Each structure stands twice: as structure tokens, then as C-alpha cells.
Amino acid sequence: MQNQRIRIRLKAFDHKLIDASTQEIVETAKRTGAQVRGPIPLPTRKERYTVLVSPHVNKDARDQYEIRTYKRLLDIVEPTEKTVDALMKLDLAAGVEVQISLG
């Protein structure tokens, strides 16, 4: 797998969960002899929702909710066969979306 690069994008709603998963991937890749670039924190997406509290009148009474999506980017440079096998067997926490691309 010479001149290959594995790019891993992680998404989660909980920043502690995404940091723990990122650290686990970095440790696994370094243990198998690959070089890791990152983790690079990407911009956090904040979605805000405003909901009327009253079912009929009182337009001034509203609740506001926010959901944050945290993202991280990892590049594994010059991965070995052991690196790919270890990453495939890695069991990450539920709630973390993982996108893997070869480049």
C-alpha cells in the first residue's frame, strides 16, 4: 500500500465521545507502524430551533434548542496491511459516524 493515504472523517453530537474515538484510532494506527496526521478539528455545526411554547396565543413565549455536530479529520499516511486490519477490527462507540476514503 505504498503511496496510499487513508482519510477518516468522524462526526458526533458529543465532543467527549468523538475525542475518545479519535484517540483510539490514532493509538491503533501508531501501534501498527503507520504515520498519523491529525486529528484536525473541523468547524462545529450549530443548528438552532425555536419552538412556540403556547399552542394558541403568546407569540413571545418560545423555547430555543440547539444541537451541535462535532467533526474531526484524520489522515493515515503510508498505512501497512496490519494498519488496515486493525482499523477494520476496531470497535468504536455508538453515536460516532465514521467515513473512510482511500486517496
Curated annotation (Swiss-Prot):
SUPFAM superfamilies: Ribosomal protein S10 (SSF54999)
InterPro entries associated with the record: Ribosomal_uS10, Ribosomal_uS10_CS, Ribosomal_uS10_dom, Ribosomal_uS10_dom_sf
Molecular-function GO terms, alphabetical: structural constituent of ribosome; tRNA binding
Domain of life: Bacteria
Example GO biological process: translation
One Pfam family hit: Ribosomal_S10
Gene Ontology CC annotations of this record: ribonucleoprotein complex; ribosome
Keyword line: Ribonucleoprotein, Ribosomal protein
Disulfide bonds: none
Family: Belongs to the universal ribosomal protein uS10 family.
Binding partners and assembly: Part of the 30S ribosomal subunit.
Role according to the record: Involved in the binding of tRNA to the ribosomes.
Full protein name: Small ribosomal subunit protein uS10
